[in-house]
Amino acid sequence: MHDVSLYLLELLENSVRAGAGHINVGLRIDHASDEFQMTVDDDGQGLNAAPEQVLDPFFTTKEGKKTGLGLSLLRAEAEAAGGGLSIGPSPTLGGAQVHVTMRLSHVDRPPLGDLATTLVVTAVTNLDVEFTISLEGDEFGQALVEAPIAEAAELLQRSMERLA
């Protein structure tokens, strides 16, 4: 994959396929600590395999597929950019949680891509799913912003333009 927004799309699609009725997306951009964080929590069916299996590129639970490259590629990208990936049960919603960290200034950090459009398109094509977006960091003008999808996407789009 070429940018973080495509990984976010994959995570959101996984949540929807797992039957999530509520998905929390947390994005944190902190220049002081040189860190980007992305968390996706859902109330879907949770992990149907051990986290080690889910991160194996040759394991998938998707019918008709032979590999499950998305999470393993995301983990490799995160580690290459001085961060990591953790996956497990969601402590707040009871489904699954994926948490990704990367150093913002790392030369190997993939571009963030169009995170705002990814969030909006996913939300409008899955109207039966409730999305909560949390934006944190100096890019967003406040310590923490929780907003409806359209408002959060607009704020996110403006901040991504400044990062470009």
Regions found by a protein language model. Give the residues of each.
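Conserved beta-strand-loop-beta-strand hairpin that lines the nucleotide-binding pocket
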Residues: 2, 6-7, 13-115, 133-138
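N-terminal assembly/transducer modules of large multi-domain enzymes
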Residues: 104-164
